[in-house]
């Protein structure tokens, strides 16, 4: 996120929703409206912890019809690289944060009427704004299936069951023996429905596997993953050919983080290997691809790399930057 794109916001409220999830309400210091967004959008939040910066993408879960405030929810991850832990431990009402403009990589498919949401855990967040954006009885039909570990981990359940879409909200609590039967769900859907999944990798994989067994078109499946990609590995050297800069990438640091700490500006959005914004060409060396953006053939070709999650297999990697 370049400085010119930063929006400085104040945290006006922090709520503990579950043992692991907090909701943060953000507003401009002067109370002016924030930039418009659509359901499924996220913002990149930048946090300064001493000399170290953390950059995390979070879905906007508030209504797109009211931009006086943004709301995000942050789950504290056990394997946090620092961002979620910082938000939980150091961010309170009155804290000022820098965010990027909203970007949407998870929009509803245009010209489709029936949209079915499948959420696991914190993966519920992008669907909250989708539901708030579209009133029941409108041009689109929305249906939510939300699975979570136990009653105390069911963030937003009370709001969903009291909301305008309550009749089409279905919850599944693992500790109570309730299971989301994906095969049965797919068999009940009309052929033109679009299905959206957001949650752990296992849930995403299960949705796609069940859809494939029934011959469901991939063009009608949409996913966003809410699980931290393992970006750690052995240290290596990255060379920015056009910039004439050589950097050491430590074991616990991504290439993108190393480049940013060196003061080099580079565009990025999701920082989870999904959107492709930070893709650059490989000039020398071999990448250890860990993204969800490149397909298997593209990864095997070793032509490009996503700097936010992937690493180097070789001791030295030269990129076109």
Regions found by a protein language model. Give the residues of each.
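FNR/FR-type flavoprotein reductase catalytic core
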Residues: 85-241, 248
